Amino acid sequence: MYKNLVLVDGEIMPAKEAAVSVHDRGHQFGDGVFEIVPVYNGRCFALLPHMDNLFESVIKVKIPAVYTIEELIEFHEALIAESGIENGEIYTQITRGTADYGLAFPEMSVPQLTMTIVETDREVLSAKRESGVNIITTEDNRWQLCNVNTLNRLPEVLARQKARESNAFDTLFIRENGKITESTESSFMVIKDEMIWTHPDNNLVHKNITRRLIKERLAPDIDMQVIEKAFDMEFVLKAEEAFLCGPRCEIMPVTKIDRKFIGSGVGKVVPQLQAAFKAFVERECPAK
């Protein structure tokens, strides 16, 4: 049995004892950023790239850096060790801190760090990774800085609820011009003409370490090329395969979108990527 622990400003404590001020700007305005780090076999997966993502968001929203990357790495390792969690994820959140109500940056406030660790059963999704999932689409009405992991995630919340009400696994966002960006918490890719296609890594999509891993390591391992180019549903419906990728779903085949079949099912390339991903995780996070 693991311990239900959290970290607040460098101090680890039982979750039931943790508290954050109602005047915290993250609570009042969503004035903060976050990052999610997967944990395998008691080890953080791709921790340094995830911390680079976090600091990039911190810099873009102009929150002063209180902790170094090295300190945050130590906090992650300590939280895993003291909680006893072997497989799960760590959610890190940094806000601008507590201040009187007002939209402009406060002159006197100290950024607040909170970290939570939860246990996850990845076997729950294993059957879906073999059979594939169905997803739906919705209008992408998010702001123009999706590459910043801010706490303002109401569009994703509503889109994910829409998926739940439709008995779908997730929801794809589509811009006004018809181009597909990503899902609520994963990148979206398709296999077409023996290449992997995905939306350009720009301000319209979240930074995604799994996507980066596929582009830089996994795709080359199976002799595939990743093309970053925006595409629409007409393009997707002519693809051989489609899949989501992210820290939670890993590599998840998509077999239907809005009740329309993609290719002939899971396909041949996605299982190869899944095997390459599993091997990479086992090398990076070996069992202790």
Q: Which role fits each region the language model picked out?
A:
Residues 73-101:
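Short, acidic/charged, Gly/Pro-enriched secondary-structure junctions
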Residues 1-78, 102-288:
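Helix-start/capping segments and mature chain N-termini
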